UniProtKB/Swiss-Prot annotation:
InterPro entries: Ribosomal_Su5_D2-typ_SF, Ribosomal_uS5, Ribosomal_uS5_bac-type, Ribosomal_uS5_C, Ribosomal_uS5_N, Ribosomal_uS5_N_CS, Ribsml_uS5_D2-typ_fold_subgr. Part of the 30S ribosomal subunit. Contacts proteins S4 and S8. One of its GO terms (biological process) is translation. It comes from Bifidobacterium animalis subsp. lactis (strain AD011). Residues 1-54 are annotated as: Disordered. Pfam families: Ribosomal_S5 (PF00333), Ribosomal_S5_C (PF03719). The gene is rpsE. This is Small ribosomal subunit protein uS5.
């Protein structure tokens, strides 16, 4: 065998070895990618749940004001947005955002509202008892209403009620008609609401002595309806995950 033939044979063996090594490396990479695929899908599923939770939040822009500030070199204009955020199921918050652009002001207002979320006691879509809230010169009265009444309120109060999940209520706004004062007075009223157990514990009485029988019956019916709705939602979610 000549030297040229030997060199050719060695070169062919080297190429075959490199090809085998590359194929094995590709198989390993493919296996790792497949293994990561399951984790990635699970991570995507968790991410979708979080996104769905964020998407379930309701938001209402109550008002957008144009604000100007005078400097030595002239005036600069910005926008202030009053935003209400809630889940429509007893949680609501109000925020205020300022920026030179309207979308940025609304986004800041939404973030500020999410930082000030609080729970609102409800019984079958209405408040637990009459209450009055104040903010500077603004006063807002809230009264329980029968099912089917709807939200009897102005635009500012209605935005708070919708985000809080209150569907039947009678309201009256007095004094200042400024949207900021009206919304803050509404929030002050909602924060004064109490559950019958809290009132009974403070007075040293039983719940039956504090709350009317009709109120307790409506509350029990509301709890049963909410439990049924949660079970149906879980069943739908399980069916979607199974698909």
């Amino acid at each position: 065998m000549s030297d040229n033939e030997k060199e050719t044979q060695v070169a062919e063996e080297t190429q075959n070895t490199q090809a085998t090594a590359e194929s094995s490396n590709n198989d390993e990479r493919r296996g790792r990618r497949n293994n990561r695929g399951g984790e990635g899908r699970r991570g995507d599923r968790r991410g979708r749940r979080e996104d769905n939770h964020e998407n379930e939040m309701l938001d209402r822009v109550v008002t957008i004001n144009r604000v100007s500030k005078t400097h030595k070199g002239g005036r600069t204009f910005s926008f202030a947005a009053l935003v209400v955020v809630g889940d429509g199921n007893g949680t609501v918050g109000v925020g205020y955002g300022k920026s030179r652009e309207v979308p940025a002001a609304i986004a800041k207002g939404q973030l500020d509202a999410k930082k000030h979320l609080f729970n609102v006691p409800r019984i079958r879509g209405t408040v637990t008892h009459p209450v009055t809230g104040h903010d500077h010169a603004g006063t807002v009265m809230l009264r329980p209403a029968a099912p089917g009444t709807g939200v009897i309120a102005g635009s500012a109060v209605r935005a708070v009620m919708e985000c809080a999940g209150i569907t039947d209520i009678l309201t009256k706004s007095m004094g200042s008609a400024t949207a900021v004062n009206v919304v803050r007075a509404t929030v002050d009223a909602l924060k004064q609401l109490e559950e019958p157990e809290e009132i009974a514990a403070r007075r040293g009485l039983s719940v039956q002595e504090v709350a009317p029988d009709q109120l307790l019956r409506e509350r029990a019916a509301g709890i049963a309806e909410a439990r049924k709705a949660r079970e149906e939602a879980k069943a739908e979610a399980a069916a979607k995950d199974g698909e």
